[in-house]
Design a protein with these regions (language model features):
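Active-site-adjacent beta->alpha loops and helix N-cap segments on the catalytic face
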Residues: 128-134, 191-203, 249-250, 271
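Bacterial N-terminal signal peptides
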Residues: 6-18
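Metal-associated gating/positioning segment near the N- to mid-region
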Residues: 80-141, 160-162, 220-234, 241
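Active-site neighborhoods of metal-dependent hydrolases
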Residues: 178-186, 234, 244-378, 451-457, ...
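Acidic, glycine-enriched loop/beta-strand segments at the rims
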Residues: 37-50, 62-64, 363, 381-386, ...
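Divalent metal-dependent hydrolysis catalytic cores, especially in the metallo-beta-lactamase
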Residues: 109-130, 146-156, 180-192, 201, ...
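Histidine-rich, glycine-flanked metal-binding segment
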Residues: 37, 41-83
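Acidic/histidine-rich helix-loop elements
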Residues: 91-105, 156-168, 245-258, 318-330
Length: 471
């Protein structure tokens, strides 16, 4: 699909040097003074002692008699709070505006994810992996602005359009080799049978890559998360699994009516802990399909302003998703289960994932704030929710030595919000500055640049958003 390139210099707080994610080149020094700091190394909020950023990293922290000649000094006020950048491990860029299949949205979404404070996003299964690879490389070169993009490549399993049901473990291994050679370090399985999943996990690990899975109850040819954990999977999406998901029906059919089984829940929680497997809860993804009665789903971002005028016109005559009682029940159960998982000592294994392939009513990049609010609504403390969104995600993808906390020597991926999120988690919505790769962006400028960019500009472009129509 067509990429509409935005002039990078217009969106930056200071000039950009074209540079990949890991490269170190000469950059201006930035000093952040004032405000308060939640560094995610623990659960406390402190006065910001002063942060010095150079060459994309935090190089000093603390009271300084620093010669700031030539540096950009940003003076924050008492209402500002500095946080580590958010890590969204189920960040779909795919949209389905025309009920004709999902297509990757690569114009406005990178700006909006970053403007929301998500400095690292994992795509969790791609419909157009070549498109997402081009976007990742453009961001890494500095030609585009967006989060650190952890691309997954295509879905592995029947969720992939055109999936060959005669696939063998050997063919899976060959494809893993191909995608890792193209820069994929994290894979996503969905609707994949056991022998193929085992091959995917083993071959990915040979490349030091990770695997996550949208799995099932064990019904039919689906794989229960407990079985996948025994295979060595790194992360699980959506459902904890175990005996609390009976294998007599699909997960979506059995979960809403299953009788709560504390012993089964305790066993699967212990299995996650013993194998250090992370759980991506994706709570709010299910609420989108429910009644959406809570303020979790308020349109505080005025999301429609980011759609192209043409798409707004088309969608104005569409009926959005009607509530589905089964998904409302799943949403409520997930709120209950995530708190129980946290209280069982598995809080360090929870990660944040938004998972919302938008049909236009809501836009996925704003989901990180809804998911944070859902954790708190479930009964998880605000500080723990922030750690879930930062250091937990970094650990889950093997990047905790580089991102996830604000510490000297780590990459300078930071978010500055107005208002204390430990007092009201909804204050994370008030993003004023985002720093990624050590470069400071005004969130308002990113949002302004994204206005009217999401979706086709006219009927001639609409076919690019209708992949199933061309099959």
């Amino acid at each position: 699909m067509c990429l509409r390139f935005w002039p990078v210099a217009l969106l930056l707080a200071f000039p950009l040097a074209a540079v990949g994610a890991d490269a170190v080149v000469a950059q201006p020094t930035t000093v952040l003074r004032g405000g308060r700091l939640f560094d995610a190394t623990d659960t406390t909020l402190t006065e910001n002692p002063g942060l010095v950023v150079r060459a994309g990293k935090v190089v000093d922290r603390g009271p300084m008699d620093l010669d700031t000649t030539g540096a950009r000094v940003v003076q924050l006020d008492d209402e500002h709070v500095i946080l580590p950048g958010f890590v969204d491990l189920h960040a779909h860029y795919a949209v389905d505006f025309f009920d004709a299949g999902r297509a990757e949205e690569t114009d406005g979404y990178p700006l909006l994810y970053l403007a929301s404070g998500a400095t690292t996003t994992f795509t969790a299964g791609e419909m157009q992996p070549d498109t997402m690879r081009r976007l990742r490389r453009a961001i890494d070169r500095g030609d585009r602005i967006g989060p650190r993009l952890l691309t997954s490549g295509p879905y592995f399993g029947k969720a992939r359009p055109g999936w060959d049901t005669t696939r063998t473990p050997a063919s899976i291994r060959r494809e893993v080799d191909q995608w890792t050679a193209r820069g994929v370090e994290h894979f996503k399985a969905k609707r994949m049978q056991a022998d193929l999943l085992r091959a995917l996990i083993d071959q990915a690990h040979r490349h030091d890559a990770t695997v996550t899975g949208h799995l099932g109850s064990g019904y039919g040819q689906s794989v229960n998360p407990r079985t996948a954990i025994d295979m060595g999977i790194d992360r699980i999406e959506h459902f904890l699994g175990g005996a609390q998901l009976p294998d007599t029906a699909s997960a979506y059919e059995s979960l809403p009516t299953a009788t709560p089984d504390k012993a089964a829940f305790d066993r699967i929680t212990r299995h996650f802990r013993e194998h250090n497997v992370h759980f991506d809860a994706t709570i709010t993804a299910y609420g989108y399909y429910g009644t959406r009665e809570s303020d979790l789903y308020a349109d505080w971002a005025n999301a429609q302003q980011y759609l192209t005028p043409y798409l707004r016109s088309v969608l104005s005559e569409s009926d959005y998703q009607a509530p589905i009682s089964r998904f409302q029940r799943i949403f409520e159960l997930k709120l209950d289960r995530i708190k129980a998982f946290y209280e069982a000592g598995a809080g360090d294994l929870i990660t944040l994932g938004t998972d919302h392939p938008s049909w236009g009513e809501y836009l996925a990049p704003f989901g990180v704030h809804r998911e944070l609010q859902a954790f708190v609504r479930a009964g998880i403390p605000e500080a723990a929710a922030l750690r879930i969104a930062t250091i937990n995600g970094a650990r889950a993808v093997g990047m905790s030595d580089r991102i996830g906390t604000v510490e000297v020597g780590k990459w300078a991926d930071l978010v500055v919000v107005r208002g204390n999120p430990l007092a009201d988690i909804r204050n994370t919505r008030n993003v004023e500055w985002v720093m990624t790769r050590g470069r400071l962006h005004r969130a308002e400028a990113l949002r302004d640049a994204a206005q009217g960019t999401v979706g086709p500009e006219g009927a001639a472009e609409a076919d690019a958003f209708k992949p199933e129509a061309s099959r």
